[in-house]
Amino acid sequence: LELKGGMMKKKILVSGPALTRSGYGEMARFALRALRSREDTFDIYVNSTAWGQCGWIHENDEERAWIDSLIAKTVNNNDGAYDLSLQISIPNEFKQLAPINIGYTAGIETNKISPHWIQPSNLMNKLIVLSEFGKKGFDNGVYEVVDQKTGNKVSGYKVIPPVVPVGFPVRKSDGVELDLQLQTDFNFLTVAQAGPRKNLGNTILWFLEEFKNDANVGLICKTHLGGASQIDRENAEAQLKNITNNFKDAKCKVYLLHGDMSESEMASLYTHPKVKALVSLSHGEGFGLPIFEATYYGLPVITIDWSSQVDFLYCENKDGK
């Protein structure tokens, strides 16, 4: 969008999980920071949504106060009219909320989007994704469908608006003292929600199979099921024990790291002298923010040669990225 000088500010509604501790929450806050840098052009409003079972950010800082003020301003916007919307979600939730609508999504973590995403995506004027891999998912999502009115087959059913990849920026933080009480000197780190896509169960299983005889190797699992509560911690611990109980004679260690951590604490985790590599064996990533963060903090990464992380990871034995 190009807005000419001298015009009134454009009222933009940002709809997304801006206050949640989730990947889409990070996307929403990234978008808001970008818009904040152009407050001479945009009059910003926020519709803050939930994101599944994910928890909410608790930091009481200047950025949180600013987002809260935008939410309050939106509630008091009685006419409810906006010049454009930025909708941060999965495409099946996209709606026409303004004359100009932009969808901002991580896309799909596999090779092509669902046909059910096409119609709502075509309500948008433009789509923003997190990676070239995410863009390919839209490019590959071309289907043959049946016209419900005529019964005729229609080929080439696809997303029409342009799809533009925009990755996350580097956000380095100063570390803080972090007492992990590690009993092992060489430790792998995995940062993953305990769910099928992240493949955490197999990550732990394969670690135990490989290092069961090495008493100086550990795996730190920064994980949760859906939040940061005590109940969530107990359930996460139970899931880990379901795997580790099958290796009662293993000499290696599996550590559970649970609960909210600040950007400074995560920086200390990535740079901890006893943390030697990040491991991610997920089935697919819309972007892979922990992989990206580990990379820019200089922590070696072990992951698969497929999905969005190949946008920013380079393997010397392969051509390209």
PLM ranges: what are they?
Residues L13-S15, Q53-D139:
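Extended catalytic core of nucleotide-activated donor transferases of GT-like folds
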Residues P300-T303, G320:
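Short hydrophobic beta-strand element within catalytic cores of glycosyltransferases
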Residues G5-K10, K172-N187, K212-D214:
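Nucleotide-sugar donor-binding and catalytic loop/hinge architecture
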